[in-house]
Amino acid sequence: QDAVIHLAAETGTGQSMYQIEKYVDTNIGGTALLLDILTNTKHHVKRVLVAESRAIYGEGKYHCPHCGDVYPMGRNDADMAKGDFECKCPKCGGAVELVATTEDSAIHPSSVYGIAKQVQGQLVHLVCPTIGVESVSFRYQNVYGPGQSLSNPYTGILSIFSTRIKNGHGINIFEDGKETRDFVYIDDVVDATILGLEVLKANGCIFNIGTGMATDVLTVANTLCEKYGIQVPVTISGNYRLGDIRHNYADISLARRILGFEPKFSFTDGIAQFCKWVDKQEA
């Protein structure tokens, strides 16, 4: 084989906080094993593409009118208990505006999973050049689409919400429902990954792979109900989990420029395809 696409990993951000050894051994240890094999055996591998994650950015990039671009480390319990869920400027404590997170943004993983994904990328970019193998890493946003598990809660809110809706159960949304993510459809991810293998200039690069658009969680819930034609109670609970990020969406201009990547599926189009697939499954 000429290339390795290294996607294998445990993926539960929350779960990683109480199964630390499992996530470190599987994600970092698995990458180390792959690199050991590439270093110490004969093979024909010319390029390794490793999956990093948006999780390495933590809260991501914001702009403060007084302090410029800033990278909040996280939110505090006191603010969230009062229903104030937005990030604050880490320098002046003032309000900040969300902006797209670029690849050169500060790295602030807020979970063991995020740290493990960061290390996976660092290992690949460190070792591969020393053995004559090219390296590329992709920081995927929230990937979804046909084929994802509907029974594993760690595959994301689309699976969780879909299963509840199809079974006639209500949806409980944390915080105020305005928290956002960048949802990218699997077909676009496949296209990007192929480009990551084929484009020569991608060697040694790190790319954000998403849509560059933020969608809030309440919109996700309402859109799923609409697509399935099933109305269930959608409750904004105000509950929260420390360590969850508020917002994050990708700046994909580098992937556009170097890879020629352009996402084809809007959130609405991708969700429609996803729901058609779910309708054929057993919820």
Where are these regions (language model features)?
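Hydrophobic alpha-helix immediately C-terminal to the catalytic Tyr-X-X-X-Lys motif of short-chain
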Residues: V119, L123-V127, I157, F161, ...
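Gly/Ser/Thr-rich beta-alpha loop segments that engage phosphate groups in nucleotides
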Residues: G14, A32, G60, A116, ...
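The catalytic Tyr-centered alpha-helix of NAD(P)H-dependent dehydrogenases
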Residues: P109-A116, Y140, L150, Y154-L158, ...
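Short beta-strand segments
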Residues: L49-E52, S137-G145, E175, I206-T211
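N-terminal Rossmann-like NAD(P)+-binding domain of SDR-like oxidoreductases, especially those catalyzing
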Residues: Q1-Q141
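C-terminal substrate-binding subdomain of Rossmann-fold SDR/epimerase-dehydratase oxidoreductases
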Residues: I165-A283
